[in-house]
Regions:
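Metal-dependent DNA replication initiation modules
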Residues: 57, 61, 77-175, 220-240
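Signature for HUH/AEP ssDNA processing cores
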Residues: 1-102, 111, 192-199, 214-220
Length: 240
């Protein structure tokens, strides 16, 4: 990066953009976007990024998470992860960002034909997800006087398309949450559930929804929508 101004935030923002992550500036020390349209202005354009961080050299760096799913675990010792070594190992394949309050961000890419959005506390208490329509701050951004940083040996070093997919059990739970929010599918052929897979897929989704604490009524309502939107053709109601 020789020849660039001696500005650590600018250098980092350009590095993320060169990897393929769309960035935009947030207020120094905060998570609030500095640009009028926030994440909608996220870009990999190096000229625009240079302009932003030349004007606001201390601005934090936000990365748009469309096409990604970032598992946002709040605080140290979160019960969802602390005592589960298998889960820790599964998540450990992903780049990991350490947050100022002792939490972690695990960076995955969304599998093909999925279209997940953000969730807050739905996966587990104090566990959020950032996906389509979301963003996260990245190192070396600073909040409350403390920086974000990359976990040693788990730094972000690959473009978005080379990030790992979530483990299978996590995909099931995220799909279940998407179903409960009415945002499972975008209607593309890749999201269709063909004859021969409908019952098995709905049963799998029902089990995943149950594991994330949804009620029987919520599960039934979500399955009806999945059946109507994705099953080709839809199953009779009595089979849902």
């Amino acid at each position: 990066m020789s020849g660039r101004p001696n500005n650590p935030m600018l250098h980092a923002a350009l590095w993320y953009a060169e990897l393929g992550y769309s960035a935009f500036p947030c207020a120094p020390g905060r998570k609030t976007p500095l640009t009028e349209h926030g994440l909608l202005e996220a870009t990999t354009d190096t000229e625009q990024i240079t302009t932003w961080w030349t004007q606001h050299p201390d601005a934090n760096i936000a990365v748009r998470t469309d096409g990604l799913v970032v598992i946002d675990i709040d605080g140290e010792g979160n019960a969802w992860l602390a005592d589960d070594t298998a889960k820790q190992a599964d998540l450990g394949i992903a780049p990991q960002s350490l947050t100022p309050r002792g939490g972690r961000h695990y960076f995955f890419r969304q599998p093909d034909s999925h279209a997940w959005r953000n969730t807050a506390g739905r996966l587990a208490p104090h566990v959020d997800t950032r996906a389509n329509g979301g963003y996260v701050l990245v190192a070396p951004s600073v909040v409350e006087g403390k920086p974000y940083s990359w976990q040693a040996e788990h730094e972000l070093s690959m473009p978005p398309q080379r990030l790992p997919e979530p483990p299978a059990w996590l995909i099931e739970q995220l799909e279940a949450l998407a179903a409960s929010n009415g945002i499972v599918a975008d209607g593309t052929p890749g999201n269709a559930i063909p004859t021969g897979q409908r019952n098995e897929t709905l049963a799998r989704l029902a089990g995943a929804m149950r594991r994330v604490g949804m009620s029987q009524a919520e599960i039934f309502a979500a399955l009806q929508q999945v059946n109507a939107d994705r099953c080709t053709p839809p199953l009779p109601l009595r089979e849902v």
